[in-house]
């Protein structure tokens, strides 16, 4: 059942996830320059944590709070798409291909690792 407490937990952890995403994006931009390593990092981490939570059979309320709140706001499909469009407008087509391939590869790898770790945790 969806309670006020559960909604508050999603809200709180969503804020924390958004702040974590912002911090990683700023750090990566300062450290690595224009290539969107920050987006790559937060989406990979979100895939890892989300798949772990599902495979570990976390109970519904914590899964909603951590998965829907923290992980949902940490990962950013909209920023990935915006970055691809920005690179396209600048004619950085090779970087688009690299970014998309890296995003898929790291996302799939992180998901597989998260599933394995979650299954081991649940066992």
Spans of features found by a protein language model:
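Membrane-interface helix-loop junctions in multi-pass transporters/channels
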Residues: 1-123
């Amino acid at each position: 059942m969806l309670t006020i407490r559960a909604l508050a937990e999603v809200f709180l952890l969503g804020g924390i996830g958004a702040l974590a995403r912002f911090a990683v994006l700023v750090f990566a931009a300062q450290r690595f320059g224009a290539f969107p390593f920050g987006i790559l990092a937060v989406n990979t981490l979100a895939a890892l944590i989300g798949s772990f939570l599902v495979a570990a059979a976390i109970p519904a309320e914590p899964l909603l709070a951590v998965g829907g709140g923290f992980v949902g706001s940490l990962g950013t499909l909209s920023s990935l798409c915006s970055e691809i469009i920005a690179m396209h407008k600048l004619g950085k087509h090779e970087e688009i291909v690299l970014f998309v391939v890296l995003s898929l590869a790291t996302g799939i790898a992180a998901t597989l690792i998260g599933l394995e770790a979650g299954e081991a945790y649940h066992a």
